[in-house]
Amino acid sequence: MSRRRRVYEGKAKVLYEGPEPGTLIQHFKDDATAFDAQKRATIEGKGVLNNRISEFIFTRLNEIGVPTHFIRALNMREQLIREVEIIPCEVVVRNVAAGSLSKRLGIDEGTVLPRSIIEFYYKNDELHDPMVSEEHITAFGWATPQEIDDMMALALRINDFLTGLFLGIGIRLVDFKVEFGRLYEGEMVRVVLADEISPDCCRLWDTRTNDKMDKDRFRRDMGGLIEAYSEVARRLGILFENEPKRSGPKLVK
């Protein structure tokens, strides 16, 4: 097997050179991180679950006309994607108060928000991904006003789709984080959904019990992360050829 050229490695994924120009292979790792990677562990099977869940969601989004970087699945851990220029701003959509919003504004966790709220965060681990305004984004040239409009419109479409998808399987979509990129097609440039959508970047609560089914289980030392992610996959109807072996986190020194 020929050795692939590594293009980029992040906290949870590795990007390799793809088979065709303008493509990449996105590989999902078993690494779990929280608090800007100050907390780390390796959780066996997490990468497989995130890959399969994200692949499922991106496929459905493509089908309803939401532009994404996803092309097709390759194997249990990898997918073929289009190469995009990542816009350095994370987009967070909140439906229910939780996490930093609850702390920042003193709103009880679990409070349903009057409407879905969109927030922007500058992607920079050293600065702890600070929250920024549209003014910051345009002033520093991270994105144009039109690109911001596109990201917000796509984020709300994704929110509508995911809210219905998860509600149908007994899961409440509390909030989620997405990233967007610029896809260059000849002289045309368009904003598309990139990165992933998985329990790593969504807050998912069981509608009946309010049990957390996302990465908060790792952040808050609750345990049972693989079991929770597996339950999300099962409810989505994703079948595994070989279900990931359940194991506890292995702390990385």
UniProtKB/Swiss-Prot annotation:
GO terms for biological process: 'de novo' IMP biosynthetic process; cobalamin biosynthetic process. It comes from the Bacteria. It catalyses: 5-amino-1-(5-phospho-D-ribosyl)imidazole-4-carboxylate + L-aspartate + ATP = (2S)-2-[5-amino-1-(5-phospho-beta-D-ribosyl)imidazole-4-carboxamido]succinate + ADP + phosphate + 2 H(+). The keyword Acyltransferase does not apply. Pathway: Purine metabolism; IMP biosynthesis via de novo pathway; 5-amino-1-(5-phospho-D-ribosyl)imidazole-4-carboxamide from 5-amino-1-(5-phospho-D-ribosyl)imidazole-4-carboxylate: step 1/2. InterPro entries: SAICAR_synt/ADE2_N (IPR028923), SAICAR_synt_PurC (IPR033934), SAICAR_synth (IPR001636), SAICAR_synthetase (IPR050089). Its EC number is 6.3.2.6. Pfam families: SAICAR_synt. Keywords: ATP-binding, Ligase, Nucleotide-binding, Purine biosynthesis. GO terms for molecular function: ATP binding; phosphoribosylaminoimidazolesuccinocarboxamide synthase activity. CDD domains: SAICAR_synt_PurC. GO terms for cellular component: cytosol. Belongs to the SAICAR synthetase family. This is Phosphoribosylaminoimidazole-succinocarboxamide synthase. It comes from Parvibaculum lavamentivorans (strain DS-1 / DSM 13023 / NCIMB 13966). The gene is purC.
